[in-house]
Amino acid sequence: MLWTRALILELKTNKQSRLLWLLAIPLLISLTLLTYGLVLFSSSGRIDHGDHFHLRERFVLTTEELVTFVVASVVFALTVALFGLGCWKLLQGPKVDRTNIKLANSNPAPQAVVLQADCDHFQVGDHCVFSAEKQHFKQQFKQDFLGKSKFSFRNELYRFCLIGVLISLNLALSMVEIPGIVLPWGSSIQFRFFNTAILFIAIRFVGLLSTSLIAIITPWIHLLLHPVHTPISTVFYMGNDLVVLWIFYFFYYHIFKAEVKQTTTVVNNKEFSQLVNTHKTKVAKALALIPVNLICGFIEGLGFYVGYFLILGKFGSVGHKIFYDSQANRDLINSANVIYFLLTTTTIFSLKYLFELLFFYSVEKGILNISRHFGLY
């Protein structure tokens, strides 16, 4: 009973315990998968997957249902285990004076390094804004890749919790596939619209290395839950996510330097940190949209083109896979059809990345504020 009261007190008063609420996301996903599996198991019907029909019998355990139950059980068990481990860490942590809860929960961020010489360039009324000191490419890349500056050794548990949450979000959004995008010659393709945005967000949460691991792991979990895909298409999705992630990182953070700027505002001899999008930063964000959208859209379209050849194993049957009528001169061996195919898919996927980047721009400040609030950045 005393242990329970102590745990409740820690959860209420310890500021770092708020991060444990993020585990509610994988918990909700696992319960949703279990419910989905139970509904499949207890009902019968005909499911239209677009390219084939799935006949389901009541109370007959299929491979899809078995995989769903196993994955959901593993996610649920890991979530409960991480929550228990987090509670144990809270109880084992150093005790503080609970008579001053506000002081006990304070987690001030370290003061930013400022360049006072830049004060004249950021004069806003009575406020003097100092820009943060710039880092060299090698120093910033090492910091972003390993994420060392975002987590101390004591907070490694929080990194694993966040990785689990981001994998769950990426997996859930990868299930939202947009089918029936009609191509000019009458066939259609389907693509995933939202999951790449999670990778853009994850860079400033867990670092580039951990985000790359998320991009590698998620497509294979998706294959387990939705086995209508082939391993070759899974390799394509994995490779595409990795390439897009690194292209976005180098173009956005290094070539155009479009990241929101961290500044320190001095008011009445007191320093206040804030995030500012200067005019130069806004222009850089707009310019970064063009190459990232076009390059990533072309790479994903080219991946679809190569993937069909790999899946079918021979060039002559490509038309039967992509074009339903199998008419003469309608396959992807014809150079004109190849150009039309790549132009169409590049346009579609460029629009996809445009919306994802605009979404990332809209939440970028919130991402960094959350990271600072939990001491992650």
UniProtKB/Swiss-Prot annotation:
One of its GO terms (cellular component) is plasma membrane. It comes from the Bacteria. It comes from Mycoplasma pneumoniae (strain ATCC 29342 / M129 / Subtype 1) (Mycoplasmoides pneumoniae). InterPro entries: MPN160_family (IPR055000). The lineage of its organism: Bacteria, Bacillati, Mycoplasmatota, Mycoplasmoidales, Mycoplasmoidaceae. It is a multi-pass membrane protein. The chain crosses the membrane at residues 21-41, 66-86, 163-183, 197-217, 236-256, 292-312, 339-359. Disulfide bonds: none annotated. It is found in: Cell membrane. This is Uncharacterized protein MG147 homolog. Its main location: membrane. Keywords: Cell membrane, Membrane, Transmembrane, Transmembrane helix.
